Amino acid sequence: KLKDKTVGIVGAGNTGSAVAKCLQAYGVTVLLHDPVIQDSDPRDFISLDELIACCDVISLHVPITKTGEHKTWYLFDEARLNSLKQGTWLLNCCRGEVIDNQALIKVKLERPDIKLVLDVWEGEPNPMHELIPLVELATPHIAGYSLEGKARGTFMLYQKLMQVLGKDADKSMTALLPSLWSVQLDVESIPDQKSLLQLARFIYDLRDDDELFRKTILDDSSKNPQVNSLNNNGFDLMRKNHLHRREFSALRLVNTGHSDVNWLTNLGFSGIGQ
């Protein structure tokens, strides 16, 4: 059960903090590592080696930097990968080169207990084919590809344009989005992990993109050796043609029970308590 696990967030900026907020809302123990902001941030931080030693799940949310005291290029090298706890889940949704992918192949073959979820890959758009079968969930750098995310970006440009033109921004971001889905939540107790997973998959089932990724990259490359070229490997094509998923906020939950489930708003769902 996720609530019994300790999750480490490497990189506590906007994305990492959002992940931490969701996990903490669900009651998960979260540890943070971010040497760049720790001196000016009131939250508690620990060293990376301490985080690796303590955490059952590690999620990476750092920019890629090649030089300096806190460079992140190959932050997870062979030594750090080998130091992961037994059964650790390692998630990378930031930049592929934060993990040495060649070392990752070597360590994963030696330690199948480590579980991998990769949205980003060293050498994109040409991921190492040997790595893909070793990964539990694989996607083509689409973690940020949500409809709400696109709408937020468009709305920010709209607001800036209206400011430059000296006009009132009288449109709302919700006008850019389809209407909310409504789901009646009738519970006598806090939804368990299985129920939350069902809700999440109702909005977006990650397994679909995982299946498409493997089929596109592995199956197509075996049939067509030219598929590895920069312009013809399917990776960029999958990103370009990705059907943008909705976020949790697209789901309006109507609570008809008597339990206190307002904490679900911290996961991003809409409508709780209304």
Swiss-Prot record:
Please name the top-level EC class of this enzyme: oxidoreductase
**Catalytic activity line of the entry:** 4-phospho-D-erythronate + NAD(+) = (R)-3-hydroxy-2-oxo-4-phosphooxybutanoate + NADH + H(+)
Pfam families per UniProt: 2-Hacid_dh_C, DUF3410
Where does the record say this protein resides? Cytoplasm
PROSITE patterns in the cross-refs:
D_2_HYDROXYACID_DH_3
Keywords from the named record? Cytoplasm, NAD, Oxidoreductase, Pyridoxine biosynthesis
Q: Which EC number(s) does the record attach to this protein?
A: 1.1.1.290
- What InterPro entries does this protein's entry cite? D-isomer_2-hydroxyacid_DH, D-isomer_DH_CS, D-isomer_DH_NAD-bd, Erythronate-4-P_DHase, Erythronate-4-P_DHase_dimer, NAD(P)-bd_dom_sf, PdxB_dimer_sf
The organism's superkingdom is given as Bacteria
Gene3D superfamilies assigned: 3.30.1370.170, NAD(P)-binding Rossmann-like Domain
Q: Which residues bind substrate?
A: Y145
Give the pathway listed in the UniProt entry for this protein: Cofactor biosynthesis; pyridoxine 5'-phosphate biosynthesis; pyridoxine 5'-phosphate from D-erythrose 4-phosphate: step 2/5
- What are the recorded Gene Ontology BP terms? pyridoxine biosynthetic process
What positions does the entry give for NAD(+) binding? D34, D119, G144
Q: Where is the active site?
A: R95, E124, H141 (proton donor)
Keyword Kinase set for record: no
Homology family: Belongs to the D-isomer specific 2-hydroxyacid dehydrogenase family. PdxB subfamily.
User: What is the stated purpose of this protein?
Assistant: Catalyzes the oxidation of erythronate-4-phosphate to 3-hydroxy-2-oxo-4-phosphonooxybutanoate.
Instruction: Please state what the protein is called.
Output: Erythronate-4-phosphate dehydrogenase
